[in-house]
Amino acid sequence: VNNRAGRLRQWLVGLAAGLALGGAQAALHLELDTQGLTPAQIQATQQLLDEAQVLLPPKFKAALDERIPVRWSSELLEEAYGEADRRNLLLNRRLLPSLVDGSDTRIQTGRPHGTQHRELLATVLHELTHFYDRERVWTPEQRQLILSCGGLGLTSDQLPLKCQGQAGRSYTLSDDPRLLDLAGWQVKTRKHGNRESKNLFIARSPDLYEVTNPKEFVAVNMEYFLLDPSYACRRPALQRYFAEHFGWSPAHDACPGRYPYLNAGNDFGEAPLGWLDPERVYAVDYLLAEGNEQVMSRWGHSMLRLVVCAPGRPRGPDCRLDLQYHLVLSFRAFVNDVQLSSWRGLTGSYPSRLFVLPLAQVVDEYTKVELRGLQSVPLKLTRPEIADFLERTAQVHWSYDGQYYFVTNNCAVETFKLLHDGVARLAAAQLDVITPTGLMDALRFKDLVDTSVLDDPREALRLGYRFDSFRERFQAMFKVARERLKLPQADVEAWLALTPQQRREQFQRADLRASAALLLLEQAAYRRALLQAQTELKDRYLGEDAVDKARFGKAGGALEQILKDSGYLSRPAELLGTDGYGLPQPGEWEQLTAESQKRQAHLRSLRDTLNNEVRQLLSPEARDGLDLTEANLDLLGKHLRELNKASGGLELK
C-alpha cells in the first residue's frame, strides 16, 4: 500500500509539471549554433528553419515554449538527415554544401519527399514534432480525464471504459487512444484497452519507419500533413484528426469522394475494379453466417454487408431490394496454398485480409454449399458514421496485412476492430468478443443493431434480412419424394449419401411432383460431388506423393499459377507497386484499372486451362461420381419433360 501511495505521489508530481508546461503560451524559437559556420551557411540554414516554421500550425509554435538549439553535426550516420535528442536538433553536415549552393532543390533522393531539400525540410518538421509530442499539449478536459484516470490506475486494478488508454499518458499525440486507433495499433480483445505491439498497416505506407512505434508514426505523418496537399485524400481520417487537434489545416487537394476496391468475387468475367461511394450506401448490416458442426465454423462467421443502391435510385429503404449491387466485407484467412490447417490457424500462420465480395456469391456459398443460414441486421449508424466507416474500410482494404488466428484474431475480432476503429462512437462501446455469435449478442445488448427485423421470419426472408439454408428446402423436397416413393431414408443427408446409381433406381417410379423434387436434390448432390472433388485434388496436389503430384502436369501448373496470381485480390496494393501511399488517387486509377484487367484476363485463361485438364486427374471413384450425377441430371430432366407433356403441360425444352 505504501509503495502504491508513493507511486501515486510521484505520478501526480510528474503530471503537474507536464500540465504546467502544456499550459504555457510562448513562441517556438530555433536557435542556430553558428560556431564554425560561414555567413552563407548561416543564411542558408536560417532560411531552411524559417521555411519550416512558416509551415507549422500556430498552436504548435505557441505550445513549444523553449529555445531549441540547432546545429550541424558530422557524427550522424551517412543516410541520416537529422535527429533530435531531448535538448538539441541535429542536422547532417554532409548536406550543408548543397543547401548553400541551392543544388539540394534539384537532387533527387529516391526517398518519399523527392528532392534533398524537401527531405531536409521534412526532417526538421519531423524532429520538431517529437519536441511537441513530449510537451503534453492537452485541453483542460483531457487534462482532467488523464489526471482522474491516472489516479484510478494506481489505486485500482479495474478501470472504467472511458479510462482505458488514458491512465499514465505522457505525450500530446502518440499515446492518444483515438490516434492509435487510426494509426493501426489496434486494441486487443478482452485486454482492458491494451494494444497490439505491432502495426500491421504496412501496405501503401509512405515510409515504413512510421510503424516502428507510435511516436515515429506521429512524426512521419506530420511531415505529410504539412507538406503533401494530397494527404487529406490519401489519409483522410488522420488529416481530420490533426486538423481538429490544431484547430487549423494547411491547404489541400479536393478529394474525389469515392474509393476504389478490388472485387474478389469468383466470376472472372466481372469488372475487377469497383467503387465504394458513400452516397450510394444506404445502410451497413452485421451479417452473421450461422454455425455448423465443422470445427472451424461452429460459432458462425462474422461479416458486414453494404446495402448499395442501384445506380440512379434515391438512397432509401428500397435500396434493400437491389441485392445485385450489395457487397460483403469479409475477413478471411487468405490461403495461398488452398490448405486450411487448424494448427496453422491457431499459430497465426495465415494472413488475414479484408475481402470485398458480391452478396450473391456469399449467399450461395453459405446457403447452398455449406448449408448455413445468414442473418443480416442493420447497424444503427448515422450518415456521417457510415461515411467514416466506408473510409476506414477502404483504408483497411488497401493497407492492412494482418495475421489470422482462429481464436484470438478471427473474423469476429477483425470485424470488431473495423467497427471500433471506423466509427468513433463504437470505440466507446464494449464489444470486444471473440466469437461471431458473441459479437451479435454484444451489438444487440448495446442497442447498436436493429434485430426486430428478424421477428417476422417470412418478412425477414422477403426483405433480405435473412437467407435460409437450403438444407430446409432440400429436406422439404426430400419429404415430398419420400412420401410419394416410400423411400426408406430418414432425411436428406442420408439420401445425398447414396451413390448416384442407388438414387437413380427410384427415378422411373417418380411422378411429376416427385421428379421435380428429385431434380433439385440431384443438383445439390452435384454441388456436393464437385466440392468433394475439389477437396480431393487439393489434398493430392499438396500431398507428399511426388509421383501422384507429377500427374498434375499442365493442370498442376495452372493451379499453382492461379494460387500465386490471385494473391492480388487480397492484397490489392500489389497492383500499384511502391509509388503513392494510402488510398489510391485519381492519378493512379488508370494504372489500377489496366493492371487489374490484365491480371483478371490472365486468371481467366488459367482457369479455362484448369477446367479442361482437371477432370482427368480425379480418382476413378470421384470421376465416376461426377459423370454419373451429370447423367442423373440429364435423365431426370428428360423424365420430367415427358411427364409434363403427358399431363398436358407446355413442352419444356
Question: What label would you give each PLM region?
Answer:
Residues 11-22:
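Bacterial N-terminal signal peptides
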Residues 27-102, 164:
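Auxiliary, metal-adjacent structural segments of Zn-dependent hydrolase domains
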Residues 123-135:
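Catalytic glutamate of the conserved HExxH
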